[in-house]
Amino acid sequence: MKLPIYLDYSATTPVDPRVAQKMSECLLMDGNFGNPASRSHVFGWKAEEAVENARRQVAELVNADPREIVWTSGATESDNLAIKGVAHFYSGKGKHIITSKIEHKAVLDTCRQLEREGFEVTYLEPGEDGLITPALVEAALRDDTILVSVMHVNNEIGTVNDIAAIGELTRSRGVLFHVDAAQSTGKVEIDLDKLKVDLMSFSAHKTYGPKGIGALYVRRKPRVRIEGQMHGGGHERGMRSGTLATHQIVGMGEAFRIAKEEMAQENARVLALRDRFFAQIDGLEELYINGSMTSRVPHNLNVSFNYVEGESLIMALKDLAVSSGSACTSASLEPSYVLRALGRNDELAHSSIRFTFGRFTTEEEIDYAAKKVVEAVSKLRELSPLWDMYKEGVDLSQVEWQAH
């Protein structure tokens, strides 16, 4: 077993060796290096063929038409393109957007930008279980609502929203529905033929593909129009200009092909690993699971250890690669905005750790990690005067702290 142990699969995944092999074939002079937009010679034709094959592979994972897949640089760009693209195209129809307080920053900050441009955004509060229900969405809908954007799987707590039910609601009201599915490909079944979803964002690097490549699903029937945000040669039917990165696109295609093939057995294996891990740390007192345990992907366990500071716990767990909050915001020392939205107090939000498991996690690693967590939490609590007070029966919420 090699240390440190990687338990941060929701931040990024390593590239699957099969994906790396396919990518390496699209780089060198004797490989498939051409520009897919070169129409006049075989190098371009071969590259275009590889790109279109990958487009099919991405479409097949989510049961879409390949013509509905637009290549982007990742889920952040896909979120921007979907939300700004719809807002700008349909602004004559209305200027109201609905999203939730626990979306990824790529959605929240895009909405903030649109607010500066004169759009109005409603931010929904999730329930304590971290779920956004159709009832919450319905209560926020207005006559001038043009777009609802709700994520499929939350990146911090792994909860799975009922996008099928939300889609039925938005379609019946004539409102477009965007879903950020960066964390759900290869973990949750997605059938865009059945789902009433109009736009969906994908990322390769959360699904054992390379970083720097993603895609946006844009529905053809009923047709969804978006305004391109990147201007240039008119690639991707005018929705996203820029020379296509064949090697990355091929990597994403292969990663999604593998995901489709191996999802069922991998989910079962990862669920067994998570249950095994949780069973070994469950004996700790004052341990709280963040988010629903029933509507949740098997890869995620987000736990708060009361009376332990999350950052100090991460430092104590130097052999484990884990995180507090999402990779995109964990550099700030503010408590997780996702956990605050669930109603967790600052102390519990600060004491949370996200463990995320994946394709290369082993039982041996799980057992070692669980043992280290129990040791570190117990040791840090021994050092904590707050823990002593709690054990003596002091109600810490009633204590008045004073500066000296």
Swiss-Prot record:
Enzyme Commission designation: 2.8.1.7
InterPro entries assigned: Aminotrans_V_dom (IPR000192), Aminotrans_V_PyrdxlP_BS (IPR020578), Cys_deSase_IscS (IPR010240), Cysteine_dSase (IPR016454), PyrdxlP-dep_Trfase (IPR015424), PyrdxlP-dep_Trfase_major (IPR015421), PyrdxlP-dep_Trfase_small (IPR015422)
Gene Ontology molecular function: any one: cysteine desulfurase activity
Subcellular location: Cytoplasm
Reaction(s) catalysed (UniProt annotation): (sulfur carrier)-H + L-cysteine = (sulfur carrier)-SH + L-alanine
Residues annotated as catalytic: C328
One GO cellular component term noted in the UniProt record for this chain: L-cysteine desulfurase complex
Gene Ontology BP annotations: [2Fe-2S] cluster assembly
Sites where the protein binds pyridoxal 5'-phosphate: A75, T76, N155, Q183, S203, A204, H205, T243
Cofactor: pyridoxal 5'-phosphate
UniProt: [2Fe-2S] cluster binding residues: C328
Pathway assigned to this chain's UniProt record: Cofactor biosynthesis; iron-sulfur cluster biosynthesis
Keywords, ordered alphabetically: 2Fe-2S, Cytoplasm, Iron, Iron-sulfur, Metal-binding, Pyridoxal phosphate, Transferase
Major localization class: cytoplasm
Role: Master enzyme that delivers sulfur to a number of partners involved in Fe-S cluster assembly, tRNA modification or cofactor biosynthesis. Catalyzes the removal of elemental sulfur atoms from cysteine to produce alanine. Functions as a sulfur delivery protein for Fe-S cluster synthesis onto IscU, an Fe-S scaffold assembly protein, as well as other S acceptor proteins.
PANTHER family (alphabetical): CYSTEINE DESULFURASE, CYSTEINE DESULFURYLASE FAMILY MEMBER
Subunit structure: Homodimer. Forms a heterotetramer with IscU, interacts with other sulfur acceptors.
Protein name: Cysteine desulfurase IscS
Source species: Pseudomonas aeruginosa (strain ATCC 15692 / DSM 22644 / CIP 104116 / JCM 14847 / LMG 12228 / 1C / PRS 101 / PAO1)
Lineage of producing organism: Bacteria, Pseudomonadati, Pseudomonadota, Gammaproteobacteria, Pseudomonadales
Gene name for this UniProt entry: iscS
